[in-house]
Amino acid sequence: MKLLSKVMILALAASMLQACNGPGGMNKQGTGTLLGGAGGALLGSQFGHGKGQLVGVGVGALLGAVLGGQIGASMDEQDRKLLELTSQRALESAPSGSNIEWRNPDNGNHGYVTPNKTYRNSTGQYCREYTQTVVIGGKQQTTYGNACRQPDGQWQVAN
């Protein structure tokens, strides 16, 4: 399970970094595929034990990657900016368990960020667990992660 947590964190980090990338960065479909695969692997890991659990991870990752790629292909730059701004606001000041919503009025895509448990990591940084849910073209995708507050006040996915 620790390996899966690391994979999930890396996938979320790649996604958040994508929001800052210029034209040479990963495209939105690639980001969706990465996030979907990681989310599917996490979900698949909840089933079975031993080799059965590995099969669950593999199947979940594959199905999640396909669905995530389709959703990512439909998520535009404005969607990603709205998600990033909402994530920062939710992690900084929203009470645990509250949904902080975003909506792109141009295409109807929307979602919400739900901050959860707040804790201090081994270096003393404030960190939060969170859930991000997006609905793109009527299809919902949910990811889970941890982020820590940086000295400049920005929240960054924990690695």
Curated annotation (Swiss-Prot):
* Lipidation feature positions (S-diacylglycerol cysteine): 20
Protein's membrane topology = Lipid-anchor
Q: Where is the lipid attached (N-palmitoyl cysteine)?
A: 20
Keyword terms of this UniProt record: Cell outer membrane, Lipoprotein, Membrane, Palmitate, Signal
- List the InterPro entries hit by this protein, alphabetically: Anti_2 (IPR032635), Gly_zipper_2TM_dom (IPR008816), Surface_antigen_Rickettsia (IPR016364)
Look up the signal peptide feature and give its range.
Answer: 1-19
Annotated GO CC locations: cell outer membrane
Localization, per the record, is:
Cell outer membrane
Give the protein family.
Answer: Belongs to the rickettsiale 17 kDa surface antigen family.
Q: Under what name is this protein listed?
A: 17 kDa surface antigen
Organism (species):
Rickettsia typhi (strain ATCC VR-144 / Wilmington)
Which gene underlies this protein?
omp
